Structures are given as C-alpha cells and as structure tokens.
C-alpha cells in the first residue's frame, strides 16, 4: 500500500507570500509566532513577511534563536516562546533549520507527553496534529515545508535525530522565489545539491512507486536545467523559480517513500562537526551512487542520466550507470562543492564512530543496497 501526505494548501510563484495573510485570516487565527533565524532578520528577508502581517493587521512575535543544525535547546526555547506569546499559529520562515524547529515546537505543544525531544526520534506515535504552521522556505533544497520529517541535533550525544510524523506537516506551504534571491552562491549550490540528493535517493529507494518516480524524475530535470544558472546569477528569476519548484517536487516524493545512506552518512557530519546538511549530502552523493549501482536500483540509473540531460538512446545499463554518476559529479564540481571529506574538517580518527552512527540512522533502511558498518566506514574512507 502506498501513501501520499501533502500540505492542505500550497502557493507557488514570485510574490505569492501575500497569500499568507488571507490564509491566516480565513482560518480564524489571531496571532502568529514567526519562527526564523537571525541572518534572515539581518538581511531583511524576515521584514518581507513582517510587512505582509502588518498590512493585514495580524499581530505577531518573533523567535529567532535557531542554529543551522537546530538543537534540542532551540526547540525547547522556542516552545517556551510560543507559549509565552499567546500565538495560535506559526509562520516558519527559512531553510530546514527554521521549519524543522517550528515542526518540533508544534508537535510538542500539542502532544506534551513528548516534551523530551529525544522521544520523538524515529516514527513518533503522536496523537494530535501540530500547531498550525505556514511554512515559507528561503532556500531551494530541504523541502521541509512539504515533508513529514524533521531533524533535531542532540548536542550532548553528538547525534542528529530524524523524526517522522505525518502530524507535523505544515498546513500551508508558500514557495516564493523572491525570498530566495539573496541566497549566496555557496548556499544556493549546497541546498540545490541537497534537493538533487532527495530526488535521486527517493527515485532508487525500494519504496519508490509510479507517483514518486514522476515527482523525482521531474525534480532531477529541473535541477539539471536551473541549478548552475541560479548559482552563477542569483537574480535570475527563471533559475530561482525552477529550483524552488524542483526542491518542492522532490519533497513531495521523498517525504512519502524515504531516503538512503547519503542522508544516513550526512547526519553524523552535522552532529559531529556542525557541517551544513546540504554540503554533506552534496559531497557524499556521487560516492554513494557508485556504491548503490550494485543493487536492484541499477537499471534506474538510465533514468537519472536522462533526467540529467544525457542522451541515453541505445545506452546499456552499465553505460547509464557511468553517465548518471558522471553527470552528478560534473554538476557538483561546476558549482564548487567540496569533493573530499578532508576538505570540510572531518577527522580520519572519527570515521568508525561516524559509520556506527550512520548505520543506526533511520534513513539506512531505505537504501536500495543492504549495508553494514564496515561498508559505510569504507565509503567514508573513499570520500575522505
């Protein structure tokens, strides 16, 4: 049996952020907690949402104590801020960090028996839907606005906790590329490759099916068409819109069928070194694609190659595998993604511990090739 869980309502297009006010008012909400991060306040992005709320006479308060890899403390402080604010809904503005934090706040507020954030790891058995949240992404990568997942860092145990819960999905997603225009080149590149990782991992996961394949093939195509241009010229509206659409479509798929060991291996890098999630995924993706080519998913690499712009007419499966991996690696290099773990501060002596953490990650079960701690450690060494 297959299942698709999506937002009740979604808006897409330049300037569509104005729809937030109508959605809040027609649902009868009285006050908003705007969950965002300090850089978005500093660079004036949050002000664009504040303007929408002010123009509609919707009162709000702001919570912005959020790290790039949000922590248990960020969640609990945000929960306290929500309770103190008297708000009855949230607007989550940002990348996965802000939106994931808002999801966790909303779940715990309405399911107080899960105040220990660690108890939410894995498939959380919550009973109540989260506080109604309107998610507004400012990066084209995580697709947190449409997924049933969120990731919180347990700093004490150096662990990223993947939480899966259909009750956390935002009731409304607003994908406005105008809010993504200020992303610097490096963030555009890493979040874009994060979206590509979502698309490829969920395209080849054993849980993939006709509808998810449709989403992911199109997402890969759009990323191939638009990521390089979005990195080169952040003001290219067509490229920004293409990437905004791609990451959302990728999220529609992976949220419902799962991911694989690119994510399993990326999560410990964030927990150990605070490595940005997109950078970790982008670096690891080609290496894991090589590993997963020896699996039943091998035949689908032809589809990946085709979506990446390769003329696959007459290609054998083996040729398709090589072409897909090369196309992904070439795109990664073209947007200046680091190619080795040693370049991003990973320590050789940590590789075994990283492998143990990755093997125990919830995403490992979605990998098309069965794996082991030893296999993952070997992959880390190859990528080092």
Please annotate each region the language model reported.
Residues 1-63:
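An N-terminal, well-structured beta->alpha segment
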Residues 41-114, 229-240:
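N-terminal small/polar loop signature for handling phosphorylated ligands or for N-terminal nucleophile
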Residues 51, 149-257, 374:
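Carboxylate- and glycine-rich phosphate/diphosphate-binding segment that chelates Mg2+/Mn2+
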Residues 73-178:
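Glycine/threonine-rich beta-strand-loop-alpha-helix active-site module
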Residues 141, 248-281, 361-365:
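Glycine-rich phosphate/pyrophosphate-binding beta-alpha loops
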Residues 272-350:
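Gly/Pro-rich interdomain helix-loop hinge
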Residues 347-384:
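Short, amphipathic C-terminal "tail helix"
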